């Protein structure tokens, strides 16, 4: 009997072990948010890496041309050309042009960590070139060893740091290796490989050039080159640990919001309706169509409005504000295009000699103040919409009123005082800058005590300047002034309207929400306003938007926004620390209410995670996940034991944890 019992125990242990293995295998078969391999390609043509099971194996490629004995290089980069981008199944297709050379690049995922690159190059004019090329940037931070091979034998084997400054050979493959990864370029035949050191860099950078065209080109010149890039290495599934500190409460976060600047009467309404009906919108920004409100200096816009002569653009903008106000959404009013009488010089909507916008005509300052104030008063009295803050959009850059920092300070004091004298509670936005990088623009007003009473909030747009040091400038400004911080235009690529197919790419969605989580953590904003919740930069696809004729439907970006927007209103920023560079996190909470939310973007492979520091009254966390194949999917609640919660982070996903008492 004893023997049989021990035997049964042994059998049961084996059965349990088999069941565990089956469970693991089943979990591996469950649909995840990444494919086995996928190229990360910027819409201007640069390959940034290959993702395998969510982990990015980095590359830095570009296309370009070389002149004057390789001393003059022009290469593809963000906002340097006007590329076109689209996807056809597993193929990403980019068409771009540098001077007379047109490139058509097709990057195709072909499985097993391998992508195929096909580049067709052609010329529209006769020109002497050293080469049109495909280029890889080599950094010791990514790879430390290079092996260039020919069919017969290796040609070059060297550490990246000790490469010759100028080297050329014929080769069939190039291998780049590091301690954890390898990337291999394989050519169907022998091809020229040129390696050159970047003498202008302090980071020991080298370039590998693969010529596509060499020598003088004519209008009839056309070439094609095809090769593969394979990536492999160790997939990092190591766990992540988050440490929450609830003893520090920073600035409040009202929630996620959006811009509602109307530009497309046909496509905008359906997107606006869907967003407002299906997502919690905490703040909104609308347009003052100033040039249509008062086109001429001598006109009385109030009289015209009272005589039913309100311009349709103005009426639509006011109706938009009224709709938002009816939903108890606070409003920011911004002006883009001024009327001619309000500015100096000939009004031009495009840059002149590289300079955008026109300065305000100081001689008409009183008339300018009155015109804007009349609009706000009319909006309040006739549409029952109250404007919380006013700004000129991106006046640091000139889109389309251009100001210096000193002029911006004068406007804040002058227009702010005019608002106050007419009984308005409307305050001025300090900044509303085009990018985080132009923070010096706000310094004159920051250092002027007289301006303080008229400033309602500090504001910038998130198109550029994402490094921590730059973002901390804005956090510091809000802290010093004791004012809220607003990201009045949130997104990541101001040129994306040129290649809108990128909006449906998981890589774009992940990069965008990653920035927002970093903004929450570093800047502690009152709100982030998506550019936009209309058909411009639409978070929806279909119904003819950007040429997509599918049924109207939300994209991954919409679900990212909805998940972020579901943060309980009015929570305070709280520190949450973790050491991984491929993860971003932000925490919000209210100790009095006992409510806590943690947002996490995992830019890498799947991994287990643990969070510590949760208050004892928190017994569980609701968990939501958005990724390529999941749309704010609610998972099994996560138990909290002794302030600690263990959960799983899926690859390349946005995860939100919300406390339950």
Where are these regions (language model features)?
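Beta-strand-rich recognition/accessory modules
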Residues: 62, 66, 74, 86-90, ...
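C-terminal beta-strand-rich structural cap/linker in extracellular carbohydrate-active enzymes
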Residues: 221-225, 232, 637-661
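Noncatalytic carbohydrate-binding groove/subsite architecture in carbohydrate-active enzymes
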Residues: 377, 402-515, 522
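Acidic-aromatic substrate-binding/catalytic surfaces of carbohydrate-active enzymes
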Residues: 38-97, 262
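Substrate-binding cleft and catalytic face of glycoside hydrolase catalytic domains
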Residues: 244-245, 279-446
